[in-house]
Amino acid sequence: MNKITNASRFLFEELVSRIQERSKAVGIAVAIVDRNGNTQYEKFFGYRDQERKLPIDEDTIFGLASVTKSFVALSIMQLVEAGKVDLDDPVSKYIPEFTNRNQKPIKVWHFLCHTAGFYPMHRTIINEIAQKAGLDENETGDFAFCEKIALEGTKAVAELLDAQTKENGGLIGDPGNYMSYCNDGFGLLSEIVRRVGGENSFAEYVKKHILEPLHMERSSGEYVCKTGSGCECGNSLQNAKRCHDLRQRLP
């Protein structure tokens, strides 16, 4: 690995600062790790909690957001390796709620590669599912480990995707031919993991089959960070104004 010089460090940090300003990011953590697992560079910009002026540091826990898809993909491939899932199987084999009506079968690998053919659509949000189902996290426990949420969410996602697979052709093209990013496709994949993997929730599967074997003790599939755990506060922009979301899911 090329050595990081003072000049390159300065240019890099200037770039990160510009990105932070342009994106209105409250805080950013950056690290460069070599192939041997040695940290060659780390730097923390801004706050994990802007209101309380708590800075980001090496112990700050971030939500993984869409990097969660990597855990979904790894889980699916573990089940493929175990002979429990076939990438060429139609998704409807594992998720019969997804009828995939009047279209060529959408297979497991299509969702993994974002090539199922769906147009971008409203993302299914767990809080919306809970509200419609009349579920309270104080009663059910963490939503990430709640079977009822998984079932209700699967039903909602399947209906949403099925609405595009109509006789008049609601897809971008035949499955496998076009790339179109699909969050909800990975939602159905995570449900395949839950149903086939033998755990009560996708989060529990990841905990037992990925995080614990790798000794990732500060990582979890929890939907909301526990207070005081060093989590970064979720932030979003609405009408160019910053607002707080729920505390981020633990990575």
Regions found by a protein language model. Name each.
Residues 72-73, 184-191, 244:
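Well-ordered alpha-helical segments within folded domains of soluble proteins
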